[in-house]
Curated annotation (Swiss-Prot):
Top EC class of this enzyme: hydrolase
One Pfam assignment: Alpha-amylase
GO-annotated biological processes: oligosaccharide catabolic process
UniProt KW keywords: Cytoplasm, Glycosidase, Hydrolase
Name of the protein in its database record: Oligo-1,6-glucosidase
Organism encoding this protein: Bacillus sp. (strain F5)
E.C. number: 3.2.1.10
Gene Ontology cellular-component annotations: cytoplasm
Superkingdom per UniProt: Bacteria
Reaction catalyzed: Hydrolysis of (1->6)-alpha-D-glucosidic linkages in some oligosaccharides produced from starch and glycogen by alpha-amylase, and in isomaltose
Keyword Cytoplasm among UniProt keywords: yes
An example molecular function term from Gene Ontology annotations: alpha-amylase activity
InterPro entries, per database record: Glyco_hydro_13_cat_dom, Glyco_hydro_b, Glycoside_hydrolase_SF, O16G_dom_2
Family to which the UniProt record says this protein belongs: Belongs to the glycosyl hydrolase 13 family.
Length: 509
């Protein structure tokens, strides 16, 4: 198979917030089709489409109830097939989100599984007896707050690493793995060019379900047992043999709990697993992830720590695996915070951030709106829609009282996922040109000064800076394939490095 994906620039679309074609306030597939020429103009080669499958939308589509049907608000299967065709007509490719660590609790598999202990689908999920006192089988926590176990009428608990409406699939069951490979084949046979695999690092469980040892008062813990289970790489290698190896495709795994040594296992071509993974390490520089308050416990940003972290990933995977290059996506806030930053400072900030990674080795991932400098939004707590924020508020502020409401509000203003999910700002009209109806989530109030129309009219805009960076990458193999060496390691003001490839050197100041 070719390695076309190494030279690709990826544009991520969060479809419910991208463009609404029918005025119902909810982005859709026809809206994506209408904006493909804009993405092509930027210079992207691949579109990553966040989940559009049928779903109750408890977690905005990351809770799938039917993997072969499109959610009605997004459109139909025919709309999806048309989108695939239109992307290919423009010389681009499209990858979809594969969410198979868990399904929705409204999936037919779970509807059967919950009926009785002897149901044929029972082992599609993890069911365990309670402890002697009737409590959860262990002290594992859910990433979206609370316990990772919920009880059902069959007197057992089922496992869910995220929301209770997202029960974890049992990858130990060969029938489950076959279901996954079949659904992947269904879409790849219809032209999908690859997958971004949601929390793929969690599909293998520690099936003895040990309790975490903890020295604090937390009743539930999220930690090392939540990822990198004993059969993880066995499962991914099997997926590669059964499906991926039959297609000339791009594969990206979300593996937030992985260090560089684990990343080598995923991405070393000789192991036949994935092309690359997303790591979160560089995104957690300003948070105390392992504190009782998790990502909401802020700490001062350390630019030297960022440089060292990114350099460690560059050098560890050099000539072994491959990196992803990103600072924004649907799970991360905007890099540029809301506030009084002037237009010129915003532009300089965005250019500096893109310079620090876009010329590293790996695939650049651009999240919708990043290319025009969209910022974090400004909204009161009650206006946030995200399940993660609502659950964390209840747990940390109301129940555990480990954060004050004001401290939590400040943390959400910096780290909330909804900042990335506000509607795409196309122009300075009502609802930023996203919809003719009422948008499903409040539009960022800065849309009148930050929008696509304004960006395209300004030849010195962030959009055109990104376009030039992409063009440079396409014209210079040293940016794609060159070795990496950091300069001025201890200087907090300068992130400079050298790339070198076949006698050519590039200094990035």
């Amino acid at each position: 198979m070719s390695q076309w994906w190494k030279e690709a620039v990826v544009y991520q679309i969060y479809p419910r917030s991208f463009y609404d074609s029918n005025g119902d306030g909810f982005g859709d597939l026809q809206g994506v089709i209408q904006k493909l020429d804009y993405i092509k103009r930027l210079g992207a080669d691949v579109i990553w489409l966040c989940p559009v499958f049928d779903s109750p939308q408890d977690d905005n589509g990351y809770d799938i109830s039917d993997y072969r049907s499109i959610y009605e608000k997004f459109g139909t299967n025919d709309d999806m097939f048309q989108l695939i065709d239109e992307v290919h007509k423009r010389g681009m490719k499209i990858i979809m989100d594969l969410v198979v660590n868990h399904s929705s609790d409204e999936h037919a598999w779970f509807a059967e599984s919950r009926k009785s202990k002897d149901n044929p689908y029972r082992d599609y999920y993890f069911w365990k007896d309670p402890k002697a006192d009737g409590s959860e089988p262990n002290n594992w926590g859910a990433i979206f707050s609370g316990p990772a176990w919920s009880a059902m009428s069959t007197a057992q608990y089922y496992l869910h690493y995220f929301s209770k409406k997202q029960p974890d699939l049992n990858w130990e069951n060969e029938a489950v793995r076959r279901e996954v490979y079949d659904l992947m084949t269904f879409w790849m046979d219809r032209g999908v060019d690859g997958w971004r695999m949601d929390v793929i690092g969690s599909i293998s469980k520690f099936v003895d379900f040990p309790d975490y040892e903890t020295d604090d008062s937390r009743p539930y813990v999220v930690g090392r047992y939540h990822s990198n289970g004993p059969r993880l790489h066995e499962f991914i290698q099997e997926m590669n043999r059964e499906v991926l190896s039959r297609y000339d495709c791009m594969t990206v795994g979300e593996a937030g709990g992985s260090d560089v040594e684990e990343a080598k296992k995923y991405t070393d071509p000789s192991r036949h697993e994935l092309n690359m993974i997303f790591t979160f390490e560089h995104m957690d520089i300003d948070t105390k992830q392992h504190s009782p308050n998790g990502k909401w416990q802020m700490k001062p940003f350390d630019p030297i720590a960022l440089k060292k972290t990114m350099t460690r990933w560059q050098t560890a995977l050099m000539n072994v695996g491959w990196n992803t290059l990103y600072f924004e996506n649907h799970d991360q806030p905007r890099v540029i915070s809301a506030g009084a930053m002037t237009r010129e400072l915003r532009k300089q900030s965005r250019q500096s951030i893109s310079n620090s990674s876009a010329r590293h080795e790996g695939n650049p991932f651009i999240y919708q709106g990043e290319e025009i400098g969209m910022t974090n939004s400004e909204m009161p707590l009650e206006m946030y829609d995200d399940l993660e924020i609502k659950n964390a508020y209840r747990e940390l502020v109301i129940e555990n009282k480990t954060m004050t409401e004001e401290d939590f509000r400040k943390a959400v203003a910096k780290k909330g996922r909804d900042h990335a999910r506000t509607p795409m700002q196309w122009d300075d009209g009502k609802y930023a040109g996203f919809t003719d109806g009422e948008a499903w989530l409040a539009v960022n109030p800065r849309y009148q000064e930050i929008n696509v129309k304004e960006s395209l009219a300004d030849e010195d805009s962030i959009f055109y800076y990104y376009q030039k960076l992409i063009g440079l990458r396409k014209q210079n193999k040293v940016i794609v394939y060159g070795d990496y060496r950091l300069l001025l390691e201890e200087d907090p003001r300068i992130f400079a490095y050298i790339r070198e490839y076949r006698g050519e050197k590039l200094l990035v100041p």
